Amino acid sequence: MISVNDFKTGLTIEVDNGIWRVLDFQHVKPGKGAAFVRSKLRNLRTGAIQEKTFRGGEKVAKAQIDNRKMAYLYADGTNHVFMDNESYEQIELPEDQIAHELKFLKENMEINIIMYQGETIGIDLPNTVELVVTATDPGIKGDTSSGGSKPATLETGLVVQVPFFVNEGDKLVINTTEAAYVSRA
C-alpha cells in the first residue's frame, strides 16, 4: 500500500479493479476542510484517462508490474508484433490496446512491454523519440526561430506543430507524453 501523498508521475496503482498509471497529480490544501490529491490516471488495459480525487493520506495498492525490453518488429493486420531481443520470443498486441503509442513507434525501436501477473497490458515509450518530417510547407525567407508555427507530418503519420524553419527530411525530437515538438535532432 502506498499513500496518495507519495504519488509520483509514472507510478502504477490498483484502484477500482483496474491498473492505472498516474499521469499527473496535484496536492490541494483548501483554506477550510481537509487536504486532498487530485489526479489524472490512465487505465493500462483500456487506455482510458480518468480524473480521480483522493482524500489526503488515503492508501491505495501499488501494482506490481514487470517491464520487458522488446523491439517493435511490424504490423500484422490489426496486431503489432514485438520481440524479446534475448529470448527471441514474439508477442502480438492488438492495435486498439496501443493506439496512442503507435504514433511514435518505428520498426526495430526498443521499448518496454508492461506485464501484470503474466498478462501483457501495454507498452512504455521513452520520454522522447526521433522522427523524420515527411511533409510540411516550405520555409519562407525571413522566417525566424521565434514566433509562429506550422503543421508537419512525421514518418509515423503523427502531425505536430513545428517552427517555420523546419523542413521536409529534418529529424526532430518529439515529446511522447504531449505529442509535441522539442527540438531538431
Curated annotation (Swiss-Prot):
GO cellular component terms, A-Z: cytoplasm
SS bonds (residue pairs): none
Subcellular localization: Cytoplasm
Xref: Gene3D superfamilies: 2.30.30.30, Nucleic acid-binding proteins (2.40.50.140)
Manganese keyword on record: no
InterPro entries: Elong-fact-P_C, NA-bd_OB-fold, Rib_uL2_dom2, Transl_elong_fac_P/YeiP, Transl_elong_KOW-like, Transl_elong_P/YeiP_cen, Transl_elong_P/YeiP_CS, Transl_elongation_fac_P
Signal peptide range in chain numbering: none
GO molecular function, one term: translation elongation factor activity
Chief location category: cytoplasm
GO BP terms: peptide biosynthetic process
Sorted UniProt keywords: Cytoplasm, Elongation factor, Protein biosynthesis
The keyword Glycoprotein is assigned to this record: no
Known role: Involved in peptide bond synthesis. Stimulates efficient translation and peptide-bond synthesis on native or reconstituted 70S ribosomes in vitro. Probably functions indirectly by altering the affinity of the ribosome for aminoacyl-tRNA, thus increasing their reactivity as acceptors for peptidyl transferase.
NCBIfam families: efp (TIGR00038), PRK00529.1 (NF001810)
Family: Belongs to the elongation factor P family.
Protein name: Elongation factor P
Recorded name of the encoding gene: efp
